[in-house]
Structure formats: C-alpha cells, structure tokens
Amino acid sequence: LIAAAHLGHDGVVKQLIAAGAPLDHVNNLHWTAMIESIVLGNGGARHQEVLRALIAARANTQLTDRMGTTPLALARSRGYDVMVAMLEKAGAK
C-alpha cells in the first residue's frame, strides 16, 4: 500500500484497501501510506485520489513522521492546498 501510495497508483491503492491492507502500517522511515502520498507525491490529481481513498477508508490522519510532523503539516509545507482541504475536512490537526 505504501509503495502504491507514493507512486500515485490510486487504482492499486483502492484494490489494496478493499483487500484489507493495513492502512496505518509504519515503514522504517516512520512513514505511512498517507504520509508517502504527500511527501513523495506531487500534490496532483492521482496523489489527491490516493489521499481521498485513504481518508475514506478511515486511515489515521494524526500519525506523524519521525519528526512528529502530521500529514496536514506536511501538505501545508508543500503548498498542496487541495490535500490540506481534504485533511482538514477529515478532522486532521
């Protein structure tokens, strides 16, 4: 799920979610699929759709990276306004 999320493969992400892939798995960088869709994504339509799918599946929007930075703060720092709005609507802090 993490690899598909960072590459913006929204269709694969949706299939993996439907198959029961763990939404909040943390990798060795301490990143989740949600964080990778922001940090390694480009903020474009495919990464937005990945984020939308993760939010809809109820992935945890509060899990932070190793530095304690939330997905919302990561999206803000990159100027990904659509992703910021999606996260805020989902209740991210």
Locations of the language-model features?
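Ankyrin repeat domain, specifically the short helix-to-loop turn at the C-terminus of the second helix
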Residues: 14-22, 52-60, 86-92
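Alpha-solenoid repeat scaffolds
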Residues: 23, 44-47, 61, 82
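Ankyrin repeat A-helix N-terminal signature
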Residues: 3-9, 36-47, 74-80
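Terminal, low-structured helical/coil segments at or just beyond the last alpha-helical repeat
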Residues: 66, 74-93
